[in-house]
Every structure is written in C-alpha cells, then in structure tokens.
A protein has these predicted regions:
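Extracytoplasmic/periplasmic ligand-capture domains
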Residues: 1-88, 92-93, 101-174
Length: 174
C-alpha cells in the first residue's frame, strides 16, 4: 500500500520500507502523474558478508578469524555481477568504508581486495589446508570432517533472498 501511495504522490517524504532499489522504476515511471521527484541519495549502502568471529564452534571461529579465509571470501564475490543483477548496474564496488568526500575516507582501504578472482580464492583456501573435498564437492577440514555454515539475512531487505542465493553460489564455486 505504501508503495502505491508513494507512486501516486500521496507522501511528502519517505524512504523506509519503500526505498529498496527494486522500486526505482515504478517511482520514475510515475513521477509526472504523481507530481514528485525521485532522488537517489549519495550514501554508503553495504550489502556484505559478516562473519561471526566469536561463534561457539571453535573450528569455525578459527577459520573465520583467518585473514586469508576472509580474503578468499572477498575474492570469490563478483561485485560487478552482483551490482548488475541486484541494482541494475547502479553502484560502485567498495569495501565497507566511509564514502568519498568524508574526512574519514581512505581510498586504499575502500578499494582493497575488490577483484573477482575465484582462482586466487581457491589458492588461499588450499594454502590454509582446506584443499580436500567431500563426495559432494564441499571443502573439508584437514582431518576430513566438515561443518555446515549458515547464511542468515534480514528479511526486511527486498533483495535479501537473491543476495543470499548469489552468495551461496559463489561459495559453491570455490
């Protein structure tokens, strides 16, 4: 209902609950009829992977705290493909940092480890001792055992399901 109010020009200002990028086309198509303007704010939006570095599972905690594991996760993620699919090509790949123009912006950090390189991701994981795989093709611990890893997301994000599915595919690829 709120989406239609916005598209009809019945709201003065609203972003929460309707500000998902998937609604952008609806708003742009209805600007003239609704007598409003759609504005894309210059802000930092972070769709990201956040590890539970303090999980009670000691083996996962050790893995998640390995710098090379986190780098492998960064290299496995195809940010260009993701932006094209989820945000119709809008956006610029960056690490989760303050935006350009902020006095806290640090370009080297913002652009670190952004390249999509599944070969490098595989090399890093192999180097950590996770080179063996089970019969389903999933990596296992050096002792041959495995763990399940859950990907949790906030369902309030309209793109959360697609984001999680893409992330799971990237993990499967490495």
């Amino acid at each position: 209902v709120m989406l239609m109010w916005a598209a009809n020009g019945e709201l003065d200002c609203q972003a929460r609950h309707i500000g998902e990028f998937g609604n952008y086309t609806i708003y742009k198509e209805n600007e003239a009829a609704g007598d409003y303007t759609t504005v894309i704010l210059n802000r930092t939006k972070c769709d990201g992977l956040h590890m539970n570095l303090t999980t009670k599972n000691e083996r996962l905690r050790a893995l998640f705290n390995e710098r090379d594991f986190r780098l492998a996760c960064s290299y496995m993620f195809n940010r260009e493909e993701y932006l094209e699919f989820i945000y119709e090509g809008f956006g610029t790949p960056k690490q989760y940092t303050p935006p350009e123009g902020s006095p806290l912006y640090y370009e080297k950090l913002a652009n670190a480890y952004l390249e999509y390189d599944p070969d490098k991701a595989n090399e890093l994981l192999d180097g950590l001792g996770y080179s063996e795989r089970d019969s389903d093709g999933y990596r296992v611990y050096p002792d041959g055992s495995g763990d399940r890893v859950s990907i949790n997301y906030l369902a309030i994000n309209i793109n959360a399901t697609q984001t999680t599915e893409m992330l799971a595919d990237y993990f499967r690829d490495i």
